[in-house]
Amino acid sequence: MKKLVHALVLIGLVGVPAAAMAAEESPHSLSANVGLYSDYVFRGISQTGGEPAIQGGLDYSHSSGFYLGTWASNVGWLEDFQGYQKGNVEIDLYGGFRGDIGSTGLTFDLGAIQYIYPGTNNSGFNDADTSEVYAAIGWKWFTVKYSHYISDEVFGIGNLSGGTGDADGSDYLAISASVPVGETGLTLGASWGTFSFKNNGNYDYDDWKVSAAYDMGKLSKVMDGVTVGVAYTDTDANPAFWTEVAPNSEFLGDSTTTVWISKAF
């Protein structure tokens, strides 16, 4: 009997770590990022007038595919266009659901994002806060994303910006590729997008970008999560509508080269 009890105890002790190893991982995950950029360029348009930007974000995701996040950056265009008083920050709030489409190899992403610009808009200037819903489909290195705007004003463009009415119903379509170069840590990217502003067609434009990013963790473990990159962007935006007012007079849709360093946690 003692031998039997002893054997059962040993089996139990062996089973404890096995059971612990079999425990499921948490379905929740939290990540953060921070970066320094020589220019904040969004869809081909400089948001800082060629000046540097500090950016950071926090993201939550669930194994089901649900996600939420927030992100922030300094901006310059609100004050440079004399549209806002002390409007030098952008805060984004977003959420959605993403996952695989069966066994097709395709992925999907459905979500919404609110762009918030704290501050007071001057008389005669539209509110810059913008609401967007989006849908994307991906395959390997390629992504097609459609964004549709449901706010009356879209980044300050609307019935007070020389158009014929509100800009809700505007849209942006983008096609992009992000291709890793083997196991080198280098990733090459390219994208093309087209922005169409409802009732404000003078602001319509196409943009394109090529980029390269390198994972510094390939050089040293202490650099894990650090990425450096460079990107070239250009647009066919009309300078008459995308140039800041004097004394800056910066054409925000001009071709530009941006360098950056970021850290993911």
Label for each model-derived stretch:
Residues M1-S29:
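Cleavable N-terminal export/targeting peptides
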Residues A22-S29, G65-L68, D100-T107, V179-L188, ...:
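Short loop/turn motifs that connect adjacent beta-strands in outer-membrane beta-barrel proteins
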Residues A23-S61, G65-G76:
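Short glycine/proline- and aromatic-enriched beta-strand/turn motifs that initiate or cap beta-hairpins
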Residues H28, G50-I54, G87-I91, L106, ...:
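Residues that define the transmembrane beta-barrel architecture of outer-membrane proteins
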Residues A32-V34, L58, L68-T70, G95, ...:
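Membrane-embedded beta-strand positions of outer-membrane beta-barrel proteins
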Residues L36-F42, H62, A72-G76, G99, ...:
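Transmembrane beta-strands of outer-membrane beta-barrel pores
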Residues S46-T48, S63-D127:
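Surface-exposed loop and membrane-interface regions of Gram-negative outer-membrane beta-barrel proteins
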Residues V210, Y214-M216, S249-F265:
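Outer-membrane beta-barrel "beta-signal"
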